[in-house]
């Protein structure tokens, strides 16, 4: 009567891509790192949250470093060697993620800050008074 669900696991095919772009998005709460090819197709990604950090630990530089090590391991399985790095956001994991990518053996050809700056757009959140 009922169809059986397809339980076949989709294998990730090994692409052989030598160079790509690492997008490091570091917010106040989390750090996500996505490695794409030159056209923008995602090769590998990771974040501090997917590495098991919860709550305020996700926003630490160490969590960003662990996420960068994980995504670099995944990207090197596809044969990636050189990276351009685009860093966005105001968070604390920017520099540590960049250092972890360099320490993983990638040749970093360029580093760009692509943080969006509003031309008087949305009203910002209120200042914290501690």
UniProtKB/Swiss-Prot annotation:
Per its UniProt record, what InterPro entries does this chain match?
A: Ribosomal_uS11 (IPR001971), Ribosomal_uS11_bac-type (IPR019981), Ribosomal_uS11_sf (IPR036967)
Keyword check for rRNA-binding, yes or no: yes
Pfam families per record? Ribosomal_S11
| BP term (GO), one | translation
* UniProt keyword terms in alphabetical order: Ribonucleoprotein, Ribosomal protein, RNA-binding, rRNA-binding
The record's GO molecular-function terms, alphabetically, read: rRNA binding; structural constituent of ribosome
Query: Is the Ribosomal protein keyword given for this protein?
Result: yes
Lineage top rank: taxon = Bacteria
> What are its GO cellular component terms?
ribonucleoprotein complex; ribosome
How does this polypeptide assemble, per the annotation? Part of the 30S ribosomal subunit. Interacts with proteins S7 and S18. Binds to IF-3.
The family annotation for this protein states:
Belongs to the universal ribosomal protein uS11 family.
Q: Which NCBIfam families match?
A: PRK05309.1, uS11_bact
Task of the protein: Located on the platform of the 30S subunit, it bridges several disparate RNA helices of the 16S rRNA. Forms part of the Shine-Dalgarno cleft in the 70S ribosome.
Protein name (database record):
Small ribosomal subunit protein uS11
Name the source organism: Nitrobacter hamburgensis (strain DSM 10229 / NCIMB 13809 / X14)
Q: Which gene underlies this protein?
A: rpsK
């Amino acid at each position: 009567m009922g169809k059986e669900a397809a339980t076949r696991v989709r294998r990730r095919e090994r692409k052989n891509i030598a160079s790509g772009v690492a997008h490091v998005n570091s917010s106040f709460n989390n750090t996500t790192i996505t490695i794409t090819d030159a056209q923008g197709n995602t090769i590998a990604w990771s974040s501090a949250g997917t590495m098991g950090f919860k709550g305020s630990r996700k926003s630490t530089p160490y969590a960003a470093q662990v996420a960068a090590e994980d995504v670099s391991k995944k990207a090197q399985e596809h044969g990636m060697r050189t990276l351009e790095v685009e860093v966005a956001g105001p968070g604390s994991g920017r520099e540590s993620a960049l250092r972890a990518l360099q320490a993983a053996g990638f040749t970093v050809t360029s580093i760009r800050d692509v943080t969006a700056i509003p031309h008087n757009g949305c009203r910002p959140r209120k200042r914290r008074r501690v």
